[in-house]
Structures are given as structure tokens and as C-alpha cells.
Amino acid sequence: IGELWVAGPNITPGYWNRPDATASSVEGRWLKTGDAARADAEGFIYIVDRWKDMYISGGENVYPAEVENVLYQLPQIAEAAVIGVPNERWGEVGLAVLVLKPGQSLDRTAVMSYCAERLARFKVPNDIAIIEALPRNATGKVLKRELRKQFMGSQVPAIS
């Protein structure tokens, strides 16, 4: 898995009046998309996550979308977002931020057990937080940077 870079006549030469953003995302004729992608044996490219959302736990790359796809299989979960949070031993560990469907309940042990049966050990979230709604931008995209701000260095809210 690597970062997807693209080039062609339809690609922007850079960001308008933002030289720092251009310098970090444009290299020659190539635009760094910020997408984590893989190619199969036939050359088809699959986007697996956003590069900036990946975190490293114990030296292993964890792509939150993979963990979120497992979490969405739990019938109690309406929405899920996984972020990396600091950990003294592993560098970072996963925190699953969940929104439950109305009238549902879910405990940490059930989530951990479910994930442990379907994911490599280092991908299983270290903890969960249940909140009312995930922060989103105007187009509906989950704002993981807001979740990171909310949960960095603070105790995870009690699970109800």
C-alpha cells in the first residue's frame, strides 16, 4: 500500500495562492492525492483509505477504513470512525468512536471480541467511545481531525 500519485493534463498545477500546500502535494508533474491505495496483479488500483488517517501501532500500519468496515457489521452501530491516539508502549493505538442506532447498547468487551475474531491483533481498537454524532463538514465527510482534537490526551467518555 502506498500513496496514490496522479499526473495528466486535467491535474491542477497547484493550489491558488497557497505555495506551502502546493509544495507538499505537487512534485513535478505529479499530484499526491493523499489516498492510500494498492494495485492488484492486473494493475487495477484500489483506494483503501486516506493516507493521513493511517496510524502506526507497534510498527504496523493500520488503515482505519478496514477497522471501520468490520465495526459496521455490528447491527447496533449506526456510524463508526477509528482514529489513532498516543500510547506509551505501541506509539499509537486505535480508538473506535461509535454512534449507536436508537435504542441500542453495546459494551467494550463485545466490540473488542468481535474485532479480535476478524482483524489482526494490532488492528483491534484499544478502546471505544460512544457519542451522539460524528462531526462532519458541509459535504458530510467525517472530520477525523476534530475527533483527534476531542480525544487526544483526555479520558475516553464513559460508555453508556
Predicted regions and their residues:
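FAD-site-proximal beta/loop scaffold in flavoenzymes
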Residues: 29
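Acidic/polar alpha-helix N-cap and adjacent early helical turns
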Residues: 149-160
